[in-house]
Regions:
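Positively charged n-region of N-terminal signal peptides that target proteins for export
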Residues: 1-5
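Sec-dependent N-terminal signal peptides
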Residues: 6-14
């Protein structure tokens, strides 16, 4: 009976801890550290801070080898995604229910040229479904107008070099 009690308590603590949402989402970029901030698209102030930080920071200061800086958003509509997308990318009509959006900025270690990419992908149940890639062929152009982008289905091989922290289990509005 005692063992049953302890097992039940362990299960309860584990369940509660794994279903917690951060109380105060914040931006805290530390050198060499992968960051993932969970927030709602309604949190415009935090979004502004994130984009201002990224756009005003040199790529070398933001990125560290294969590591990526990732932000996970709760996306409820095409309009939400359209507002979040850099360069105002045209996005397709999708079922956004229970999807989350992950936005990463990273530098690929597998290319000889310095290629900095912004990467956004929809994910459901922790699986990437759709990818928006913004590639720049030089550090100088990383935050300029010379970036091009494409929207495409993403095979698993294409995200193998993204840090695992970028593809954590999706959080949705039902949690």
């Amino acid at each position: 009976m005692k063992n049953c009690y302890y097992l039940c308590m362990l299960f309860l603590v584990t369940f509660v801890c794994t279903n917690c949402e951060p109380n105060n989402p914040h931006v805290d970029y530390k050198e060499g550290e992968v960051n993932q901030i969970i927030l709602s698209v309604e949190d415009k102030e935090t979004l502004d801070i994130i984009f201002q930080h990224v756009e005003s920071t040199k790529a070398n200061d933001l990125l560290n080898d294969a590591e990526a800086k990732c932000v996970s958003f709760i996306v409820r509509s095409k309009t939400d995604l359209q507002q979040l997308a850099p360069k105002r990318v045209n996005v397709p009509d999708l079922d956004f229910e229970n999807y989350s959006l992950v936005w990463c900025v990273y530098e690929s270690p597998y290319l000889t040229a310095k290629v900095t990419s912004y990467r956004m992908f929809m994910q459901k149940d922790g699986v990437a479904q759709l990818n928006v890639d913004y590639k720049c062929t030089s550090i100088a152009a990383a935050f300029g107008e010379n970036c091009h982008y494409a929207l495409f289905d993403i095979p698993s091989a294409a995200i193998k070099y993204i840090n695992v922290d970028c593809v954590q289990e999706s959080r949705n509005s039902n949690n």
